[in-house]
Amino acid sequence: MSGHSKWANIKHKKEKMDAKKGRIFTKLTKDIIKAAKEGGGDPNTNSKLRDAIEKAKANNLPNENIQRAIKKGTGELGGANLEEVIYEGYGPSGTAIIVEALTDNKNRTAGEIRHIFDRHGGSLGAAGSVTWMFDKVGIIIVEKDNSIDEDELAMVAIDAGAQDFSAEDEEFEIITEPSNFQEVKEAIEKAGYKISEAEVTMLPKNTIQLSPEDYEKFEKLIDKLEENDDVQNVYHNVEIEDENDE
């Protein structure tokens, strides 16, 4: 029930992506459109839409933008027909990379993603080439404070169906199956705990460490992928070092 923080790599990625306000607004808007398209425009009956709206509000996306995105997703407003596309590839030293995109033009996006891989020492792979190196899981983060009883929180999470619970330096990490992610999340919230982050993500089964030279190349590749407007998420199996330890 403990071990190396799974959230560390994700948090590092999110902080870099969220630093660009315009970039995160684009991503949040697309998340809302996708959720509304898949499950309808009512957040009371569409948990994915509810989560997308919560994230948007937490990042100060204007309510007008949120409502417009919902209407685009349900078809009330005209707009581009977004499709979800998954790309798999390799970075420096054979590192595994998964790219999730939402696009209105798959040919354009595929060409751009391939170009980024090629220019930065990587290569685009076939479907299934690296996904076997990852597990799709739900991850829920509750920040530590003196009022939280670790054993009680663990019991709430495990009783609701969580796979794993761990206490890290600054937070508690709860891992779930994607299928019961929402159920566990709601049980934790109902018990009175404040969730700081919650998402379904791809966690590498094993991480690898790179030499300083390869790590620099790898970061440039990831940065360029994340700068692409169609890219929603980038997952990889590289161990992110704590910058405070360098």
Swiss-Prot record:
GO biological process: regulation of DNA-templated transcription
Superkingdom of the source species: Bacteria
Main location as per UniProt: cytoplasm
GO MF entries: DNA binding
UniProt xrefs under InterPro entries: Integrase-like_N, TACO1_YebC-like_2nd/3rd_dom, TACO1_YebC_N, Transcrip_reg_TACO1-like, Transcrip_reg_TACO1-like_dom3, YebC-like
Disulfide-bond pairs as recorded: none
Keywords: Cytoplasm, DNA-binding, Transcription, Transcription regulation
One Gene Ontology cellular component: cytosol
Region listing for Disordered, in residue ranges: 1-21
Compartment(s): Cytoplasm
Family recorded in the similarity comment: Belongs to the TACO1 family.
HAMAP family assigned: Transcrip_reg_TACO1
Protein name: Probable transcriptional regulatory protein Teth39_1009
Organism this protein belongs to: Thermoanaerobacter pseudethanolicus (strain ATCC 33223 / 39E) (Clostridium thermohydrosulfuricum)
Species lineage: Bacteria, Bacillati, Bacillota, Clostridia, Thermoanaerobacterales
